Amino acid sequence: MAEDDIKIVMFCCNWCSYGGADTAGTARMQYPTNIRVIRVMCSGRIEPQFVFKAFREGADGVLVTGCHHGDCHYDAGNYKLDRRMRLIYKLADELGIGRERIHHDWISASEGEKFAETVKMMVDRIRALGPSPIKKQLAEA
């Protein structure tokens, strides 16, 4: 799969991981441009249907990022995300998407380098996996 064909949707917490994206950009760190960032107020607000809609809309992978445990602006949003991610991974396997197409991580506003590394890791993983099975099904329909 050519790198230009890879599409990854990344949900970023407004208070931490979006700041990490900003830090990476401001510091001119190099990372693939295959991501489309969606800024959410809190990672705890990310519902399973958001992740699966990204796949229906043509994403090959989804990244979900939020504040480190203990740093949530809203107290426990990242703990809610932890619980939801267990469900999301299970559903991804049951739907034939595969949990390896989804990744969640904690990135603070000062971790621009971690942001860039996480994006690179995900692009490499998706390149190895090839197009999303949902994308293939939609192309055949």
Swiss-Prot record:
UniProt cofactor note: Binds 1 [2Fe-2S] cluster.
Organism superkingdom: Archaea
EC number(s) recorded for this UniProt protein: 1.12.99.-
A Pfam short name: FlpD
InterPro entries per UniProt: MvhD/FlpD
MF terms (GO), sorted A to Z: 2 iron, 2 sulfur cluster binding; metal ion binding; oxidoreductase activity
Cofactor(s) essential for the protein: [2Fe-2S] cluster
Keywords: 2Fe-2S, Electron transport, Iron, Iron-sulfur, Metal-binding, Oxidoreductase, Transport
Assembly description: The F420-non-reducing hydrogenase is composed of three subunits; MvhA, MvhD and MvhG. It forms a complex with the heterodisulfide reductase (hdr).
Function text: Part of a complex that provides reducing equivalents for heterodisulfide reductase. MvhD may form the contact site to heterodisulfide reductase.
Stated family: Belongs to the MvhD/VhuD family.
Annotated protein name in UniProt: F420-non-reducing hydrogenase iron-sulfur subunit D
Upper taxonomic lineage: Archaea, Methanobacteriati, Methanobacteriota, Methanomada group, Methanobacteria
Gene behind the chain: mvhD
